[in-house]
């Protein structure tokens, strides 16, 4: 496919397709071409694609003719603009309506318009029709804004990268077989729809996404459904090419999107039909099974460590076919209801053809699931609140009033005599609270400071309402006038409250909370309740007790949102026969935890549980107090309570009353109201840990008490008896996974399981929980999917073009978008797209975003990142310096380690290339021989790209002038807040004076609690919006770095480059080559597949693994545990006295005896490679997290040369830490080379081990001096 319009990109296309060398000149020429390309040019290039018939399908004409919006809205009794629900109670998303009648044309782009100002002004004056029109106009605009950048940029990058044709895979020694763009149905649809909408108009783009907002094409065929539809089509078009999705499946996905656009609301239709692909593929696979292999993992004891051992493979046979009940009827009904019967029957027909579990069958599931829409769903804040915060649970068996004692302040105690199942809830929380309060560390001033600091962040926390509630009792707060910080942060709030007594701040516990919104993919939008500082403060005992339960009493996994932070092997184990898994999720969990059942019991349990361990003590700045005790009938007594109990009293008052939610809907003028809700607040520090604790506790009660009492079926009884929450039920928040271990006879009978599940559902109804249970032969946990031990990445949940924009704040200025673009690339790596296609597309995309026009003084200039910046950020080169193409893997690390790795792989080639191209010199360097590398790297902009990549991509706001005394008053207030306990301050002071004696001068700027107030101050500054000057300053800095000429890389990288390796033979595979472990990572996707089988999959929780590599697991927010760790390791490495380590630990708040003991341990302990490498800031790259990098460090990297010892490679006895750095360097090279991970042997250290060690030690001493 040669396009006339794309000819200017030809050299770039050849360089990213591995035909010619990549060079910065070619890259920057292409970047210029990208920036000159107009939107209409993109559509002209699309016109040139000769689409084949199989890419076409009928587009329903109804997507262009939509009714006016006014019949979809009304004004309710409280004078709020509301959405009329036609399709069902949740039909409150953006309606698919015409929009042209609301627009006024743009002054220069006359074909485009935006919501007319006249309408907005009438809306401000309260005119009903105008308020309705404005609401529709704004929310439709918000739906159109949920993208990272204009769609045309993503499309152009696709046209450019795919113009290179098929790619030659040097590992498989053949060209890939992904059909070209002429078979890309979503792209054809994109073109046709845009053509039809623009009709005779000269402009082809249906809408413009600009920093000023969204401008709509003034066409009668334009509707609010077009932007989300186009966004989905572009996503699918890109995925079809870069993941090699099956075009016939993608076509079914396109049909659903077109149906959504033809319906009365795009987002609502998508939400109702999102289960179609998983339901008819993943959840109905293998009804007959004739073969294949699944992993045989053993879950090592204790299970809570989440370590697994690979025991080989297990062949699958007929007896492991899907035994769960069929979902055929349910699936067909859904298809009929939404006019998608043909899609459903086509999918089911295809699913039945897979009777063997292998690479092809799991790829089919992955491809199908990738076809679900990936837009961020949007609805107005008003509707979100009224949908989410009006549900109250139906509790079938409430706790009888007589089972409670009389009041003790705000709580009542549950009597032992109660027959309610609440007694088990009470017992668990009571025990956990008692043990938590009995732990000495709970009372340690540092621990309390960590708790008090964890919510002091640059995020908002309903500050306005907090201030109002305090003004109401005549407490005035310092306003820190003239301070250049963002006031709507909890940092600012903490400073304001730092010196107020609890008797004042406690008033704010009942203050309103403001409103936050999160838009999500394939889920309804959530409202977030940002709690204020006093509210978070009194939630601490609730959080701590829940943490105790989750740490000591159940199998909870904590995890972040990134795939790499979740426990992947758990899903592999749970879904591999003969094990079976049941996915249990609690519907509307926040709404189901209310005072009526849960919170009243939990508050009483904690209040009583902590009583004996906390007598008279204050906690986290909350003093002891006295309450009225009427628990014994007819007797009124005054009862002294501790600080912790005082917190529970205040928290109970809040939970009992409910939260008063202040909704100020920026999309609907005049929709300002306060809503009382009993729903548990999603912004509390307790939310997640609290739900987890209740989830496991209620399951334990079911397995041990309620279940056995409600059945006499011997099989079900035996099954329940064999399950425990310490071994078989993993949960996090409202998400649970029940794992039924296979027995010697094989799988547990599915009818027995069915009976138990029916009991669980019935059980939940007693206390208002609706358990959503899926038992279908697959495991789904924390949005990860597994079948027969193979992970199915859900590509649709990582939309390439989509971005959550929940509020109307402006887009972040360039170059911040580059972080998002690199984020897209790394998502694709974790999701196992086709490695070559993905690297090529990512190069095109990065190039398209690498250049920006800017004002430099009075003149227009251009800022341009060289291609090398992207390499530094982790994008692997394709072919460079005359190398073969595709020799660099996407597992190449970022930063200095990555630079070291790719340079080391082709170092002799680079020298040859430089000399051949006239960069020769008489001086010989240990790294590049007789090449004049300094001149070369400056001329090809390698040095400039390297240094530009390390500069901030957001404007720095901490340089703003502030009145000195106000600034000092502010940091002093933060210091008072943090050091609220004088004992803590004296520890730090003592540490400081010890440091002067034993540590000064060894390392600079050791981390200390005294740094935290200033760090918080900087954080509150950085949260503010950048000014023009700050943007210009950032641009200027980038410009200077680009113009500068350099003489070397960083000191570290220069030292690394002195180390040479010899790559040797491949190892035996770590896992069976027939075993699908991750859909899409298979022999058709050579490099990721060979890495997976040669390095092996990660078989333990990465989070637990890294937690073991830290001396201090937790610290105050504002200090970094890694920084503390590396300071301690540097001290040890530089031969500091143990007393210096003790001083360092005192400065971060440890008590002396603890600091002393830990320092002794650090001096003697054997430290792991991953931990030691921190001394030079080396860390395991994210892309390695799914692989067994630990055994790679241990077994693939050999520090003894292949042919025996050399003087140069010997490590001096006192420099054992060097080994860790060397292992990282060797592993970096192994992982950066494509193909099988080989064994690598140390060959030479230029100048010897001792000299290298000394270079690193010098660097450690100097590091931090500039900071």
Curated annotation (Swiss-Prot):
Q: What reactions does this protein catalyze?
A: RNA(n) + a ribonucleoside 5'-triphosphate = RNA(n+1) + diphosphate
Question: Where does this one sit in the cell?
Answer: Virion
UniProt key word Cytoplasm = no
Q: Which UniProt keywords apply?
A: Capsid protein, Nucleotide-binding, Nucleotidyltransferase, RNA-directed RNA polymerase, Transferase, Viral RNA replication, Virion
| One cellular-component annotation, GO | viral nucleocapsid
EC number(s) given by UniProt: 2.7.7.48
Please list the GO biological process terms of this entry.
Answer: viral genome replication
Class of this enzyme: transferase
**In terms of one coarse class, where is the protein primarily found?**
virion
Pfam families recorded: RdRP_5
Entry superkingdom: Viruses
In what residue span(s) does the RdRp catalytic domain sit?
555-792
PROSITE patterns cross-referenced by the UniProt entry: RDRP_DSRNA_REO
What Gene3D superfamilies is this protein classified in? RNA-directed RNA polymerase lambda-3
Which terms in the Gene Ontology molecular function aspect does this entry carry?
nucleotide binding; RNA binding; RNA-directed RNA polymerase activity
Q: Which family does it belong to?
A: Belongs to the reoviridae RNA-directed RNA polymerase family.
Please give the function described in this protein's UniProt entry.
RNA-directed RNA polymerase that is involved in transcription and genome replication. Following infection, it catalyzes the synthesis of fully conservative plus strands. After core assembly, which consists in recruitment of one capped plus-strand for each genomic segments and polymerase complexes, the polymerase switches mode and catalyzes the synthesis of complementary minus-strands.
Q: This protein is called what?
A: RNA-directed RNA polymerase lambda-3
Which source organism does the UniProt entry give?
Reovirus type 1 (strain Lang) (T1L)
